[in-house]
Structures are given as C-alpha cells and as structure tokens.
Amino acid sequence: DNSRDELIDELKGRIFYNPLSGGYEIKDRFIAGNVVDKAERIEAWMAENPHGEREREALTALQEAAPRPITFDELDFNLGERWIPTGIYSAYASYLFDTNVRVGYLESMDDYAVKCSVRNAKILDQFCVRGYYRTYDGIALLKHALVNTVPDMTKSIGKDENGHDIKVRDSEGIQLANAKIDEIRNGFVEWLSEQSPEFQKRLTDMYNRKFNCFVR
C-alpha cells in the first residue's frame, strides 16, 4: 500500500516499528521505560526472526536513548543496600572476621540474617562491645551495620525503692558500638575497591541494569 508506506516514510524518526508487539509506536511511547531491557529483547527477537531496516532503526533508537552507564568509581556503595547480592556481603564478612560467615536476606521482614559457625577473637573481642546488660559481638554489630542502626544500650545507675534497676541510656556504650559499626560499613567500601576489575564490572553492570536503564 503506497499511501501507508509514504505515511510511514513521512513519520520517520517520530514512529518506530516494535517487532515485539508487531506494530508501529510513537517515539514517546516506544523510547520509554526500561529501554535497555527492551533493546535486549528486540535484539533476541532479531536473532531468531528475519528482519530488515525498520527493526534495525528501532533497535538503534533504543540503544542511543539508553542512559550513559555509570562507572564503578562513580557509584556510592553502602553496606546493606538491597540490590547487592547477599553472597557479596557473605564474602566481605568472611574476610572481615577471618572465618566463614553467611548473610541471608529475609524479604518478608526486610531484614538480614547472619550465621557464623565458628566465632573467633575478631568476633568475640576486636569487634565486640560489652554493655551493662548485654554483649554485642561482631556478628550482632554486623547485623546492625547491614540495616544501618545502632543498638539501644542502657545501664543501671543504682536501685529504686523497690530494688529495681534505675536504667539510663549508655551513651559510652552506644558511641563505642557506633564506632565499630562505622568501621564495618567503611571497610566494605574499601574491600570493594580492592576487588578485581572483573568483579567491579559485574557489580557495576548489575547496578546499571537495575537502576540506570530507564527513559521517562
């Protein structure tokens, strides 16, 4: 149909053929959302199906619209970010404490579980804070570090007339716990920077694919 072909020609650059839906879409609709994923799906479609200029144009438009990939050095990593696989946290914690540590993520509770079968001097002494009522070892402090909280520590300053402890906030204990938690959190960023370029690239690609792939 000549008139249809002429119209498509006239609208070149303003409409694109989407082989996934089998029809033309206006530019604002086609080049929107997760363009990286859309481009990959069209590429996969093209590998399996005969295609021509219109599919190639659509793919190029999506690829050109994709946001510039963020580099490893530009990323601001924080321990406990949910997009980072727990295997990476397990590897860091095992390195930090010099023993096998496993970190798991409980999605329903939005919390982390930390397991360690052998607690050594690093966990029981170096990364440990002894409060008046409770001792927080390295594993307990790692759990706080992962969710960016500090233990709410109290101490007794004597007894009331009924013989119960008069409890006040243990500011010193909290400060010490905070310092150790900061050490754990900052250590993660340093540890990442010491990993291989391949490791860093995989992590950066993961970030870009998850967050840096949208056109609004």
Region locations from a protein language model:
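ASCE P-loop NTPase motor core, strongest for the SF2 helicase catalytic module
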Residues: 209-216
